Amino acid sequence: MSKLEKLVEELSTLSVLEAAELSKLLEEKWGVSAAAPVAVAAAGGAAAAPAEAAEEQTEFTVVLVDGGDKKINVIKEVRGVRPDLGLKEAKDLVEGAPQNVVENVSKQQAEEISKKLTEAGAKIQIK
């Protein structure tokens, strides 16, 4: 197996979050950007305006769509994610679904929070 094939095999085992982190580290080390300005330029000037409008979202909102059957577990996780909430506020948030759990967080934070709440039994949407 060649050096490149071994590297491909190793990279294939990374999770999406690990791959994103690797991408950021390589961008920093090599002083490049993974953005695709070349593709926009190659597409022509007419396509440039829609591409700018469709910029990647940087801030996300985690929405609790449904508390599910295991509301107690979900309430505990909501309190873990939002320590500023008391028990009553967390309970009201879960029972009043759909509700925003957190707003203006990074994609990675939104995915981590979504995973925790989903594992607790909630139905989550990231906007």
UniProtKB/Swiss-Prot annotation:
Alphabetized, the UniProt keywords read: Ribonucleoprotein, Ribosomal protein
Domain of life assignment: Bacteria
TM regions (residue ranges): none
Signal peptide (UniProt feature, chain positions): none
GO terms for biological process, alphabetical: translation
Enumerate the GO terms in the molecular function aspect.
mRNA binding; structural constituent of ribosome
Please verify whether the record's keywords include Nucleotide-binding: no
Pfam families annotated for this entry?
A: Ribosomal_L12, Ribosomal_L12_N
The record, for InterPro entries, names:
Ribosomal_bL12, Ribosomal_bL12_C, Ribosomal_bL12_C/ClpS-like, Ribosomal_bL12_oligo, Ribosomal_bL12_oligo_N_sf
One GO cellular component term of this record is: cytosolic large ribosomal subunit
Q: What does this protein do?
A: Forms part of the ribosomal stalk which helps the ribosome interact with GTP-bound translation factors. Is thus essential for accurate translation.
The text of the family note is: Belongs to the bacterial ribosomal protein bL12 family.
Description of how the protein assembles with itself and partners: Homodimer. Part of the ribosomal stalk of the 50S ribosomal subunit. Forms a multimeric L10(L12)X complex, where L10 forms an elongated spine to which 2 to 4 L12 dimers bind in a sequential fashion. Binds GTP-bound translation factors.
UniProt name for this protein:
Large ribosomal subunit protein bL12
Organism ancestry: Bacteria, Pseudomonadati, Pseudomonadota, Alphaproteobacteria, Caulobacterales
